[in-house]
């Protein structure tokens, strides 16, 4: 769920720095520490090089990621041209929604724009956590609600705002994002 939040620093023991980032994120969402520890056990650290794909068109998305470092581009190919639909960075979840939830081939590509570090969790683990961990289920539902709201806002903005107005909104809501994108 691509939403950035400020960090809070809490002593989470001797975890890997990337795992601490995810734990801090979950703490900021109000999940209890015991639930967070059992949730984050299911995540694995993955390094991606610039240009490496997290999801490729035609392949089924088996993993959801949490970005601890780096930028990612969501795009479609149309007539051989890349059409970027979204760019996201640290402290955001990363997934091809339709492919992940339907477990069907993806229509989009998600590619690292910079060297990146992500934490990944397999689809089966997400489904298991939804059944076994009430705190995760509550987080999952809230995240999906926020995603639906964000998608509705995007749809509305595409209809009622000009390209210039959408660009100004991007500058207002994500002032650092454009500076981070490599040219």
Language-model features: locations:
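Short N-terminal helix-initiation segments at or just after the protein's N-terminus
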Residues: 9-17, 52-62, 89, 128-131
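Cyclic nucleotide-binding regulatory module and flanking cytosolic helices
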Residues: 9-44, 99
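Short, flexible segments with low predicted structural confidence
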Residues: 25-26, 36, 81-83, 97-101, ...
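Cyclic nucleotide-binding regulatory domains
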Residues: 27, 52-114
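Short, flexible turn/loop "capping" segments at secondary-structure junctions
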Residues: 46-48, 148
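Polybasic "coupling" helices that flank or enter modular domains
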Residues: 111-183
């Amino acid at each position: 769920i691509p939403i950035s939040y400020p960090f809070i620093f809490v002593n989470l023991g001797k975890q890997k720095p990337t795992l601490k980032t995810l734990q801090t994120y979950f703490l900021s969402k109000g999940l209890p520490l015991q639930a967070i520890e059992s949730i984050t056990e299911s995540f694995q650290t993955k390094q991606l090089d610039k240009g490496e794909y997290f999801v490729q068109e035609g392949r089924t998305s088996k993993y959801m990621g949490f970005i601890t470092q780096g930028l990612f581009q969501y795009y479609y190919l149309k007539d051989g041209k890349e059409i970027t639909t979204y760019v996201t960075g640290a402290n955001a979840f990363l997934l091809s929604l339709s492919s992940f939830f339907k477990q069907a081939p993806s229509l989009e590509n998600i590619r690292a724009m910079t060297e990146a570090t992500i934490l990944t969790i397999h689809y089966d683990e997400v489904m298991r956590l939804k059944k076994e961990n009430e705190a995760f289920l509550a987080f999952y539902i809230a995240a999906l609600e926020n995603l639906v709201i964000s998608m509705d806002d995007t749809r509305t903005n595409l209809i009622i705002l000009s390209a210039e107005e959408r660009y100004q909104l991007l500058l207002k809501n994500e002032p650092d994002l454009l500076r981070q994108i490599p040219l």
